[in-house]
């Protein structure tokens, strides 16, 4: 077993039935609370697509109102040493940006939270999809390293080395 990814899926009917009681902002805050609890459980190496909630009723997703909750969540995740995912499949979602978006990614960098890039590759053609853009987003946020896992041990690679590896695979 190389890597255990923990994700909260707020779009699933079971999750919505249990946690959405009419107050969308409270539902969003609960989602971030669950991300922190997942990291604190110690079960996961990485927390996946950490702002996926923005795709549920995106017109009601107000980052400025949620930033305090998000920062508290990131503080808790950082304290565990758990990595977080930059998920490139967000480019194909209702809110067409990676998960997390740029501001949350910058906040992760400020807390020195390691990042793994993922593509939610449910189809073979999506494997490593948009990883080049993901590496660029990491650079823009101030990261110089990207992480992956082998035998559940995190390995940090320079972004330039990861980029070179991607380019060599495209030949």
Label each region the model flagged:
Residues 61-171:
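Charged catalytic cores and adjacent phosphate/nucleic-acid-binding surfaces used
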Residues 1-80, 162-171:
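Extended substrate/RNA-proximal surfaces in nucleic-acid metabolism proteins
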């Amino acid at each position: 077993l190389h890597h255990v990814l923990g994700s909260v899926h707020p779009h699933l009917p079971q999750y919505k039935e249990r946690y959405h009681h009419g107050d969308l902002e409270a539902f969003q805050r609960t989602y971030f609370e669950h991300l922190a609890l997942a990291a604190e459980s110690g079960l996961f190496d990485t927390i996946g697509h950490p702002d996926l909630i923005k795709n549920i009723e995106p017109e009601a997703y107000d980052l400025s109102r949620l930033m305090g909750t998000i920062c508290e969540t990131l503080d808790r995740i950082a304290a565990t040493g758990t990595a977080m995912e930059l998920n490139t499949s967000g480019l194909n979602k209702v809110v067409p940006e990676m998960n997390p978006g740029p501001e949350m990614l910058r906040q992760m960098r400020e807390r020195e939270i390691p990042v793994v890039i993922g593509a939610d590759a449910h189809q073979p053609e999506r494997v490593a999809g948009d990883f080049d853009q993901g590496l660029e987003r990491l650079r823009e946020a101030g990261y110089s390293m990207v992480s992956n896992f082998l035998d559940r041990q995190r390995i940090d690679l320079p972004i330039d080395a990861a980029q070179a590896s991607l380019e060599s695979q495209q030949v």
